[in-house]
Amino acid sequence: ASGFPPIAGIWTAVVGGIICSRLSNSQLTIKGPAAGLIVIVAGAVVELGTEFGANLPDAERAFLGYRLALGIGLAAGVLQVLLGAFRGGRLTELFPLTPIHGMLASIGVIIIAKQSYEVIGVAAPKGAGPLSLLAGLPGAVSQMNPEIAIIGGVSLLILFGLPLLPIPGIKKVPVQLVVLAVAIFMGMAFNLEHQHTYLFSSQFFRSGQAASFEVGPRFLVEMPEVLKAPASAFALPDFRGLGCMTGLKFLFLFTVIGSIESLLSAKAIELLDPWRRKTSFDRDLMAVGAANVLSSALGGLPMISEIVRSKANIDSGAK
């Protein structure tokens, strides 16, 4: 959804877990990639890629935009370190929670609009905005790929239904891992690893006539062959974006939105801490900034203190 490759999220999680846990005194917050920055990161990839590689093929332009966004992310990390050093943690006292909640809600709508097409196995219209994507969903449902839709539907049912079951200790089971295990098993059962065509008969498709659908590796997440080609797991930042207004715009957004959301998440988790420990928000901001510098240098996504994972951390008994 952000325009970054999947391996970028892994780098962010690894760097956040190692660096921030040593530098920050926020005991319970989980640092990593978050939905709150998806729209900004995706915008940076698209706009910077278009500005510096308008004549390139789509794949090359997207990769260039990715590298340019890494340069912006690294510079934003440096600014976050400086903000923390100059007592920028006081930003938590200046911004009310309501606009942040509104921003997060809008981001949720955008993610739903984009990923609903993926869940049912239909290609989303390129360049369409969230409202256009939502308006096109009814038509997309009539063209859905049944096997992919079954995997998506079962995964959502487990994700939202499993925690509601009245079974002792069920909430301590990481439901995301259950979803992942079930989805992998279903993907193997449907033989998604190999390109093939299957028939599906239903009143929903073509007036009850059996319809043919294609499935194959394109429905699987593409991961780089790290062991065969270690260099493919990394990407170097491109700093040319810092010399244009588009790049400076996203530098401001990366720094301010990332810092505010991270600080507010840390503040919320401080209130939930069963031991009532106090967090140094300046120190936490410096830790996030330092981790963002390293993450961007490796090819990772920008990170923040993530409220959902941090709350799950507390619910799982973290101290």
List where the protein language model places each region.
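Transmembrane helical cores of multi-pass ion-transport proteins
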Residues: 1-319
